[in-house]
Curated annotation (Swiss-Prot), chain A:
Signal peptide feature range: none
Protein name: Cytoplasmic tRNA 2-thiolation protein 1
Keywords per UniProt: Cytoplasm, RNA-binding, Transferase, tRNA processing, tRNA-binding
Recorded name of the encoding gene: NCS6
The protein's role, per its UniProt record: Plays a central role in 2-thiolation of mcm(5)S(2)U at tRNA wobble positions of tRNA(Lys), tRNA(Glu) and tRNA(Gln). Directly binds tRNAs and probably acts by catalyzing adenylation of tRNAs, an intermediate required for 2-thiolation. It is unclear whether it acts as a sulfurtransferase that transfers sulfur from thiocarboxylated URM1 onto the uridine of tRNAs at wobble position.
Bias type Basic and acidic residues, positions: 328-337
Family membership noted in the UniProt record: Belongs to the TtcA family. CTU1/NCS6/ATPBD3 subfamily.
Organism: Arabidopsis thaliana (Mouse-ear cress)
Swiss-Prot record, chain B:
Annotated source species: Arabidopsis thaliana (Mouse-ear cress)
Role this protein plays: Acts as a sulfur carrier required for 2-thiolation of mcm(5)S(2)U at tRNA wobble positions of cytosolic tRNA(Lys), tRNA(Glu) and tRNA(Gln). Serves as sulfur donor in tRNA 2-thiolation reaction by being thiocarboxylated (-COSH) at its C-terminus by MOCS3. The sulfur is then transferred to tRNA to form 2-thiolation of mcm(5)S(2)U. Also acts as a ubiquitin-like protein (UBL) that is covalently conjugated via an isopeptide bond to lysine residues of target proteins.
Site of covalent link Glycyl lysine isopeptide (Gly-Lys) (interchain with K-? in acceptor proteins): 99
InterPro entries associated with the record: Beta-grasp_dom_sf (IPR012675), Mopterin_synth/thiamin_S_b (IPR016155), Urm1 (IPR015221)
Protein's name in the database: Ubiquitin-related modifier 1 homolog 2
Pathway involvement of the protein, from the record: tRNA modification; 5-methoxycarbonylmethyl-2-thiouridine-tRNA biosynthesis
CDD domains tied to this protein: Ubl_Urm1 (cd01764)
Length: 355, 99
């Protein structure tokens, strides 16, 4: 017993301050650290990512894509904290999308409304119903539970841009974390989606579009985000979307988590691999243009959202699912322009994972 | 022995949507210690009402489920080998839901 206690005491001091009892093993460094040091390194690392990548300019209006989930809640909290502490000079807003999913989004929006008060950040909610005339509940009623995540993902991506335009912000930040990005790298490899593979690790995307997006949590482990939210008692919502059993992404996620358990660095290493891929100049990339119907960025005649919407409104919900066909011509019109920044807006299926 | 078990991050849905459970667990065999390994198998049998695969994989929690014993990451106390004491508070949080 004596020996056991000694051993416990020896390993029981934070390896940063050497004063307090550690409460967490950092996946990034395997260091055992106490709560106070954890808050400090967690926030400081995000600050360094923001500074080193010059994510913001003083005076900018910035929208935080807020779902009410753990990542965006922690992002809203940390970003408003850092904005105050380091005088970023940012005007921060919360931007939420109401997909119209009863029992899921209506509940999570209540969380965002509380966050609005808790963090003193103005909130804007834009709904699929207002933007497209359809709620996800109505879409699922019509198309069933197959491909519904495609609709949701495509619509969300545009909805965020439109909401950002309404807020007149210069930038949109999202809570995508290191685990999400590693998972997306893997998925893009599995799908052979070279265009997305080449951009999914960028910390800022869409700089040539209307509203650039950035991911301050690019190097932040999900474990630390959840621990931070837990220790700080942040108010977040955690229920799986009732419509989203996205099996393929689920497998990738589970694989990443299995790897993390064996070697936590695997997550950062996968991101590094993603960053360091060089796409052969002979690879055909989609050419970027604008949608003839709504003017949104599109590599096709019509953007994906317009194709999907047309299908819904005409009662042909299969339209636009799978490889481009129909309005946009029989063949995938992907052509040359090696190295051009690909920007087909067909979104990642499911969840809030848009890259 | 008495424990307070807390389920969060969506895991509460697996046990009748109740987040906090005050439980009393008798020592299993003759041994006088109870480890996290014992507790997990007790939880799986007695508290998890549906989809146990969302909570466990093999004899431990599913990767992506965080465990805290008295507000301390169980990776610091030996994970499955963590020895529990009366009135310990054990928290399980899933990281696998939403963003």
């Amino acid at each position: 017993m004596e020996a056991k206690n000694k051993k416990a005491v020896a390993s029981r001091l934070c390896c940063l301050c050497n004063l307090r009892r550690p409460v967490l093993k950092r996946p990034k460094t395997l260091q055992q650290i106490c709560r106070e040091c954890f808050y400090e390194v967690f926030e400081e690392e995000i600050h360094q990512v923001i500074v080193q990548n010059r994510l913001f300019k003083s005076g900018e209006r910035v929208a935080i894509g807020a779902s009410g989930g753990k990542d965006s809640t922690v992002l809203a909290y940390v970003l408003s904290e850092l904005n105050r502490r380091h005088n970023y000079g940012l005007d921060l807003f919360l931007l939420s999308i109401d997909e119209g999913i009863t029992g899921y989004r209506d509940d999570s929006l209540e969380t965002v409304k509380r966050n609005e008060v808790q963090y003193g950040l103005p909130l804007k909610i834009v709904s699929y119903k207002d933007l497209y005339g359809w709620t996800m509940d109505e879409i699922v009623k019509m198309i069933g539970l197959k491909n519904n995540c495609t609709f949701c993902g495509v619509f969300r991506r545009q909805a965020l841009d439109r909401g950002a335009a309404l807020l007149k912000v210069e930038k949109l930040v999202t809570g995508h974390n290191a685990d999400d990005i590693a998972e997306t790298v893997l998925l893009n490899i599995l799908r052979g989606d070279i265009a997305r593979l080449s951009r999914c690790t960028s910390i800022t995307t869409g700089e040539d579009g209307p509203i650039p997006r950035c991911k301050p949590f690019k190097y932040t482990y999900e474990k630390e985000i959840v621990m931070y939210a837990y220790f700080k008692k942040l108010d977040y919502f955690s229920t799986e979307c009732i419509y989203s059993p996205n099996a393929y992404r689920g497998f990738a996620r589970e694989f990443i988590k299995d790897l993390e358990r064996i070697r936590p660095r695997a997550i950062l290493d996968i991101i590094k691999s993603g960053e360091d891929f060089r796409i052969a100049t002979t690879t055909k990339m989609p050419e970027q243009g604008t949608c003839e119907r709504c003017g949104y960025i599109s590599s096709q005649k019509w953007c994906k959202a317009c194709v999907l919407l047309e299908g819904l409104n005409r009662g042909l919900p299969k339209m636009g699912i799978g490889r481009p066909r129909g309005v946009n011509g029989d063949h995938n019109k992907e052509t040359k322009k090696p190295g051009s920044v690909a920007k087909s807006i067909e979104s990642k299926q499911c969840g809030s994972l848009d890259f | 022995m008495q424990f307070t078990l807390e389920f969060g991050g969506g895991l509460e849905l697996l046990c009748d949507s109740v987040k906090i459970h005050k439980v009393n667990i008798n020592l299993l065999n003759d041994s006088d210690i109870l480890t996290m390994k014992d507790l997990l198998s007790w939880v799986r049998t007695n508290l998890i009402k549906e989809r146990p695969e969302m909570f466990m994989k093999g004899d431990t929690v599913r990767p992506g489920v965080l465990v805290l014993v008295n507000d301390c990451d169980w990776e610091l106390s030996g994970q499955l080998d963590t020895t529990l004491e009366d009135k310990d508070v054990i928290v399980f949080i899933s990281t696998l839901h939403g963003g």
